[in-house]
């Protein structure tokens, strides 16, 4: 094990007899690096995003489907170790369990893949990001394909691992029309996509917490929609079980039209509040006039403290040598700051002492800094 310096930063090299599992994977890393180095940078970026969304969507939906299977299953003593899913109506406890499983699964996986592909896992979210210009059309199409494939893979895994079949298909509640289902899915997906746009696409100090807010958005969306439409909010989530079970209801289209319409509605709302400069909405009119510099900073996305040049110079002046500022001030204010000179004799030569006096500002307490500093910065603040 050794430490080297790369671009001024210390780098840990693992080698020698004390190699770890990470170091033993280096040959595999070299193979991948050699393979992907031949791919253009833009194409490589698409490949990374597609792989991230494929794996992330599979992991997210597999956990969500598994939680739903647990919630829907009920033990049946008369059938031995068999599991019965026959219930008259889904209970609120089951809905809560399903919603929590989907929400917490999204939090964990989105946080994991956030820096790889964005952790979208939903074609509707990808389309919303395309509508606002966050991603281009090529990336959007590739992500949607990867997300659909991931949903099919997750459904196949759940179908093959859990006996009793797959019971996570999204269906309308009896008596609910497709038109009502479209509206429900549109509203719930709009809320989810708007959360993504404000917490992830809109950069701010809490962007790193975006997966938590997005997961909570899925949680409340499932609470509101599972009973009525299955709580899809995700075309891929509805496509996966339908493909694996080869069961496409006649109203399957609502799980595409509703979420895509919701993505468009969320994009319109986002564009509207951006055009209205929502950053300044919390400031009163008096604050807008009293703090024009702070307002402009907030409008440009800078929320840090004001760092005017005069304050920077003042901070530097307090820490620099007082003699430098004294010379500059003396040259600039000779007519008002010089008093008659006093002469002293040293042998046959005469030495003149010059004392500088700076006029104190009226009604101002004396400052501990040198007098020359007060005069210099006094003129700057006066301007």
From Swiss-Prot:
Q: Where is the composition biased (Low complexity)?
A: 363-372
What effect does gene inactivation have here?
A: Leads to a slight reduction in the vegetative growth rate and delayed conidiation.
Tell me the InterPro entries matching this sequence. Answer: Aquaporin-like (IPR023271), Aquaporin_transptr (IPR034294), MIP (IPR000425)
Q: Where are the transmembrane segments?
A: 47-67, 94-114, 116-136, 141-161, 181-201, 208-228, 253-273
Specify where the region named Disordered lies, as residue ranges: 332-383
Q: Which reaction does it catalyse?
A: H2O(in) = H2O(out)
Q: Where is the composition biased (Basic and acidic residues)?
A: 350-362
Report the superkingdom from the record.
Answer: Eukaryota
* Residue ranges of the motif NPA 1: 122-124
Please give the record's induction comment.
Answer: Expression is higher in vegetative hyphae than in conidia and infection structures.
Query: Domain text from the record?
Result: Aquaporins contain two tandem repeats each containing three membrane-spanning domains and a pore-forming loop with the signature motif Asn-Pro-Ala (NPA). The first NPA motif is truncated since it corresponds to DPA.
Q: What does this protein do?
A: Water channel required to facilitate the transport of water across membranes. May play a role in the vegetative growth.
Protein name as it appears in the record: Aquaporin-5
Q: Which gene encodes it?
A: AQP5
């Amino acid at each position: 094990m050794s430490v080297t310096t790369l671009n001024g930063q210390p780098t840990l090299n693992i080698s020698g007899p004390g190699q770890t599992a990470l170091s033993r994977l280096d040959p595999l890393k070299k193979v991948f690096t050699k393979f992907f180095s031949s791919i253009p940078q833009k194409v490589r970026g698409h490949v990374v995003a597609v792989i991230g969304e494929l794996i992330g969507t599979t992991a997210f939906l597999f956990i969500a489907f598994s939680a739903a299977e647990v919630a829907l299953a009920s033990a049946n003593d008369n059938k031995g170790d068999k599991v019965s899913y026959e219930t008259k109506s889904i209970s609120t406890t089951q809905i809560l369990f399903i919603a929590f499983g989907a929400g917490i699964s999204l939090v964990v996986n989105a946080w994991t893949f956030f820096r790889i592909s964005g952790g979208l896992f939903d074609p509707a979210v990808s389309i919303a990001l395309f509508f606002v210009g966050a991603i281009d059309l090529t990336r959007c199409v590739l992500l949607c394909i990867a997300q659909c494939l991931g949903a099919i893979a997750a459904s196949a895994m759940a179908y093959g691992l859990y006996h009793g079949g797959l019971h996570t298909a999204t269906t309308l509640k009896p008596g609910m029309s497709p038109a009502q289902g479209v509206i429900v899915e549109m509203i719930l997906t709009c809320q989810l996509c708007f959360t993504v746009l404000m917490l992830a696409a809109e950069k701010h100090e809490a962007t790193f917490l975006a997966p938590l807010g997005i997961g909570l958005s899925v949680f409340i969306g499932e609470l509101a929609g599972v009973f009525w439409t299955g709580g899809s909010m995700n075309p891929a989530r509805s496509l996966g079980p339908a493909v694996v079970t080869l069961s496409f209801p006649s109203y399957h289209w609502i799980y595409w039209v509703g979420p895509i319409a919701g993505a468009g509605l969320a994009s319109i709302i986002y564009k509207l509040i951006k055009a209205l400069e929502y950053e300044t909405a919390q400031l009163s009119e008096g604050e807008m006039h009293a703090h024009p510099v702070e307002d402009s900073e907030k409008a440009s996305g800078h929320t840090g403290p004001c760092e005017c040049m005069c304050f920077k110079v003042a901070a530097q002046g307090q820490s620099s040598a007082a003699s430098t500022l004294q010379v500059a001030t003396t040259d600039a204010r000779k007519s008002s700051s010089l008093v008659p000179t006093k002469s002293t004799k040293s042998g046959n030569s005469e030495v003149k002492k010059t004392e500088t006096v700076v006029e104190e500002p009226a009604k101002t307490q004396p400052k501990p800094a040198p007098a020359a500093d007060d005069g210099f910065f006094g003129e700057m603040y006066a301007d």
